[in-house]
């Protein structure tokens, strides 16, 4: 046994008289470093925080079930804090570039996560890109504009209104405005908040969408696209709107097929990963 070992044994023995565990206390510098390492380990990246919050908010996962107001505000607060870099997107990426092809600009879909209770994704639109008017049956949807300027037009159905045909219904305009990031997260509900909406990119835009529950044909949550016509386009008995209010209403007619001017490509999400 060497001298260093003997001395070390004596030091430990002496310290054990005052330290019941017989352990040599760590110096403060090492303790601080360990605390700092622990703090770093507990930091949760924004997209992971979003995922964890969605699991709580959409725990029910049933069609038409609107989360409590407390849960809605909790998820809204998380989304309001998310920045483009938190999900790995920026305006310089190739799918935000303008192209001259004579066709509608390509919309890029980035899949982050999906289950039967909720989905998280990003829509990337170059300038003039359009997501045509469509619905969200029995869903609650949170949309966060990450960057850019976008025009949003949305409608809600007018309940119990006579219809000119089985595929055409009267709707009231909910939103018809430009939005520029940073701005508040928008929320639509199964029967309110602008359940049918259309996005038109004024500049390159990225929209982070959280949908609960997501589209599902077997569950009856099918995505339907619409044409919108001015109120004066149809004359229906029993439907009367004051002249000055007519611009606030429109007739929405179901489109039989997916819009020809909508081209969406799905690409791999390359931002921070989620741990389930």
From Swiss-Prot:
Disulfide bonds: none annotated. Residues 17-28 have a biased composition (Polar residues). One of its GO terms (cellular component) is cytosol. It comes from Arabidopsis thaliana (Mouse-ear cress). Catalyzes the oxidation of N-terminal cysteine residues (N-Cys), thus preparing the protein for N-end rule pathway-mediated proteasomal degradation, upstream of the N-end rule enzymes ATE1, ATE2 and PRT6. Controls the preparation of the group VII ethylene response factor (ERF-VII) proteins for degradation via the 26S proteasome N-end rule pathway. Acts as an oxygen sensor that controls the stability of ERF-VII proteins, which are stabilized in flooding-induced hypoxia, and regulate transcriptional adaptation to these adverse conditions. GO terms for molecular function: cysteine dioxygenase activity; iron ion binding. Its main location: nucleus. This is Plant cysteine oxidase 2. Residues 30-40 have a biased composition (Basic residues). It is found in: Nucleus; Cytoplasm.
């Amino acid at each position: 046994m060497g001298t260093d070992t003997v001395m070390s044994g004596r030091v430990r023995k002496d310290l054990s008289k005052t330290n019941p565990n017989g352990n040599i206390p760590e110096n403060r510098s090492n303790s601080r470093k360990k605390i700092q390492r622990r703090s770093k380990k507990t930091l949760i990246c924004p997209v992971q925080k979003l995922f964890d919050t969605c699991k709580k908010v959409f725990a029910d996962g049933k069609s038409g079930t609107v989360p409590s107001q407390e849960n809605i505000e909790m998820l809204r607060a998380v989304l309001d804090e998310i920045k483009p870099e938190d999900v790995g997107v920026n305006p310089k990426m190739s799918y935000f570039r303008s192209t001259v092809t004579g066709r509608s600009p390509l919309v890029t879909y980035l899949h982050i996560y999906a289950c039967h209770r909720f989905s998280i994704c990003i829509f990337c639109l170059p300038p003039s890109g359009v997501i045509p008017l469509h619905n969200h049956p029995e869903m609650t949807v949170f949309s966060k504009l990450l960057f850019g300027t976008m025009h949003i037009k949305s409608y809600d159905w007018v309940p119990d209104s006579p219809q000119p045909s089985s595929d055409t219904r009267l709707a009231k305009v909910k939103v018809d405005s430009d939005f520029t990031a940073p701005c508040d997260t928008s929320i639509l509900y199964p029967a309110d908040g602008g359940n049918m909406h259309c996005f038109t990119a004024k500049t390159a835009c990225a929209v982070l969408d959280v949908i609960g529950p997501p589209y599902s044909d077997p569950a009856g949550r099918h995505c339907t696209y619409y044409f919108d016509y001015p109120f004066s386009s149809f004359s229906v008995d029993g439907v009367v709107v004051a002249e000055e209010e007519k611009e606030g209403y429109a007739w929405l007619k179901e489109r039989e097929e997916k819009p020809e001017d909508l081209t969406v490509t799905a690409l791999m999400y390359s931002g921070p990963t989620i741990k389930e």
